[in-house]
Amino acid sequence: MKIWAKLITDGKIQKQFVYEKQERLTYSRFFDYLSDICHELDIPTPVLLKTHIFNFAKFNHVKFISRDFVESLDYDQLFLENIIL
C-alpha cells in the first residue's frame, strides 16, 4: 500500500511524502496511517470523519482543508491519494 501525501498552497505542492506499508490497506486503520503521515510531514493531525474515509474508498483520494484541523495549518490543504499498483 502506498499513499501520496501533498501539502498544497495556492494550487502548488509545497511538501510531499509517499507513505508505504507492506500490509494491505484497511479502512479501520486509516487514522493510524493519517497520524503517521502527519507526523512525517510535521503537521497536526486533522479530524477524521466518515465522509473522508468514504471519499478515499470511492475516489482513491481525500482532501483535508484548514477547517478539518483543530490547530492552525500553514497550508491550504492536505491531499492524500491512493497509489494503485
Q: Which residues fall in each region the model found?
A:
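Short, extreme N-terminal segment that most often corresponds to the first beta-strand
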Residues: M1-V18
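Short, flexible N-terminal segments of the mature chain
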Residues: I13-E40
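Acidic, low-complexity intrinsically disordered segments
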Residues: Y33-L85
